Amino acid sequence: MATHVLAAAAERNAALAPDAPLAPVTMERPVRTDLETSIPKPYMARGLVAPDMDHPNGTPGHVHDNLSVLQQHCAFFDQDDNGIIYPWETYSGLRQIGFNVIASLIMAIVINVALSYPTLPGWIPSPFFPIYLYNIHKAKHGSDSGTYDTEGRYLPMNFENLFSKHARTMPDRLTLGELWSMTEANREAFDIFGWIASKMEWTLLYILARDQDGFLSKEAIRRCYDGSLFEYCAKMQRGAEDKMK
């Protein structure tokens, strides 16, 4: 009887084990098993908010306007709130959050050229390279962290695992080297566009939001996902400009 009980217990433990002994990478990149202590149903994708263990209800004061989290990530750059982001709006948004003229110009061209066509409502390309927020989920690339799903929802579990897997120096922030290692770990076979896009996005975020010690904080990354980081950066830039006057 005792043998059967022990066997059943061992089977249950195996069914819930996050590690596989013959796959060392599963131990090198552990996943969190305590998420439900703070986040209800952390495995369930969120359509409107971007929660984590410290903010189970998302960003305080951030208005979602019934947009998906991926749409919110992009909405700051929709300068006239018409649901379409043109290159000059991308440029303006980048300038507002602190990038210089040359960097903003290059990034605006690259971003809109790369993302415009998948989001168009029809098959005919536009010479103005607009990005339609309504279809932004169609522009999601591979080799990413998996924090957005294919419909633009936010997955708290994948966000938290980003740090349990890759944050080696500090549990709630990443170094540039750790960011690079993360993008390498997320690479999917033959996904050249995804490899490049992922490295470019994380490098730009690091440049924008790193702290004085050279870390990219968990909170900055989370707020990037729901777009509230861009609003914050623009506010800080306006404050700095006002002090210069």
UniProtKB/Swiss-Prot annotation:
GO terms for biological process: seed maturation. Its EC number is 1.11.2.3. It is found in: Lipid droplet; Microsome membrane. GO terms for cellular component: endoplasmic reticulum; membrane; monolayer-surrounded lipid storage body. It catalyses: RH + ROOH = ROH + ROH. Residues 65-100 form the EF-hand domain. This is Peroxygenase. Transmembrane regions are predicted by sequence analysis tools, but these regions probably constitute hydrophobic domains associated to phospholipids. The proline-knot motif may be involved in targeting to lipid bodies. It comes from the Eukaryota. InterPro entries: Caleosin-related. A motif (Proline-knot) lies at residues 121-130. Binds 1 heme b (iron(II)-protoporphyrin IX) group. There is a cross-link at K165, K235 (Glycyl lysine isopeptide (Lys-Gly) (interchain with G-Cter in ubiquitin)). Calcium-binding peroxygenase involved in the degradation of storage lipid in oil bodies. May be involved in the interaction between oil bodies and vacuoles during seed germination. Keywords: Acetylation, Calcium, Endoplasmic reticulum, Heme, Iron, Isopeptide bond, Lipid droplet, Membrane, Metal-binding, Microsome, Oxidoreductase, Ubl conjugation. The modification N-acetylalanine is found at A2. Expressed in seeds (at protein level). Not expressed in stem, leaf or root (at protein level). Its cofactor is heme b; Ca(2+). Belongs to the caleosin family. Homodimer. GO terms for molecular function: calcium ion binding; monooxygenase activity; plant seed peroxygenase activity. Its main location: other. Heme binds at H73. Ca(2+) binds at D78, D80, N82, E89.
